[in-house]
Amino acid sequence: MASLVFSFRKLSLFFHTTRVISCQESCAVLSRSFFSTHIVGDEPILVRDFIHSALYDANHGYFAQRSRSVGVMERSIKFNQLEGRKAYMIYLDKIYKQSDMSWFTPVELFKPWYAHGIAEAIMRTANLSVPLKIYEIGGGSGTCAKGIMDYIMLNAPTRVYNNMTYTSVEISPSLAEIQRQTVGEVRSHQSKFSVECRDAADLSGWGEVKEQPCWVIMLEVLDNLPHDLIYSENQVSSWMEVWVEKQLERESLVELYKPLQDPLIKRCVEIVNFNENDQAKSSLLSKAKGVWSRAFPKPRKCWLPTGCLNLLEVLHRVLPKMSLIASDFSYLPDVRIAGERAPLVSTKAHGSSSDYESYLDAKGDADIFFPTDFLLLEQIDHYCSGWLKLHGDKPKTGKKRRTIILDTSSFMEEFGLPSKTRLKDGYNPLLDDFKNTKFYLSVPTHNIK
């Protein structure tokens, strides 16, 4: 059963058992495909650039190769007709074997109810006296977009549906086409839905600043955003940024450490450290740490969500009145890669999943996905809105945001219809299987400083 649970596209990872690829196997696999080493040319690159290429390279990246495996289920699961968890797992196994898909997203597994919960959250919070504008980043198969538009068509005032627009920002051309087909099944949706095939984190793709209120939806986007890695020799040494370089005369990659100099990394480090307790900065504690680190030196690594910071900086700049709904992992089990907020690097073949021991082994055949520190996400959101000021920031107007972090079960109990995903014995996979995921909601306020 463990292998089919992975097909949830990671969301039930606390059930997930994997086979770790040995160094010997990794080297053998690497010798068959040199894409990962070709990511790095003669000059070193930052870890975030390596990860971006490994995932999103147009020809060899993981999502370019796996876009066809993003499944669209022919029909919704009739949860109320299943006896219990065992019957549910058997049914899932049958679906995956019939479809030959690597994974279905949760919005697909629980359609239309997952998307309906998001739509209800939007309708309760949005100002429906102005045209409703929704952007979805990384829209997958289009099931979320269709579910939200269906719900608004059936439950909102007619003028709200008639005047709404829904824009998907999708980096994959093949997924963009699937989204058009999925949403286009309802003819009245077609004039309201559009796909822009581009990178949402690229400021130039957005054009002029859009001052109208809008919603931005990001489901399982944060986990695949590029991260940077910083390194310290011990508990008190300064952080250094990590670069990836190719070893001379060898088809292998190694890490290179440099003093912090990248502006995005430096901003992210400052946000991470913003709420550091004043006692941690005291000279007495600093001296104690120094003695301890010399007696028991321990290298440190920390993964930084610089891709998230970059994306939110872009969104707040071009959509200053946006409201945000994001859902992702709050933690990942059995992570073997070193560092705080470290990712899982996992590949799947012939129905079984395998975890790599190093992110450097990713070569377009492996998903690289990170846990989301939702409190840090909140800090980044406040920084990008201008409310949180860092040392040395230029004076600027900032708007406070009203935010809330909810477990997936709490979100769906508040905004969804949990009875629709409950099995006969009371087991509810949407509420019971997603303990390692959360929702983040953020809306602008009128408070300015």
Residue spans for each PLM region:
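Short glycine-/acidic-enriched loop or helix-start segments at secondary-structure transitions
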Residues: K146, P226-D228, R336-I337
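A short SAM/SAH-binding and catalytic strip from SAM-dependent methyltransferases
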Residues: A201-W206, K210-Q235, K298-T306, N310, ...
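Rossmann-like AdoMet
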Residues: A2-Y135, S141-C214, I230, L375, ...
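Long, Lys/Arg- and hydrophobic-enriched amphipathic alpha-helices
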Residues: F104-L109, N277-K449
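Charged, glycine/proline-rich intrinsically disordered loops and linkers
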Residues: G71-F104, E249-W292
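A mobile, often basic/glycine-rich helix-loop segment
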Residues: W215-S283, P343-K348
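A structural signal for short, well-ordered beta-strand segments and their strand-loop junctions
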Residues: I134-E136, S168, W215-M218, S323-D328, ...
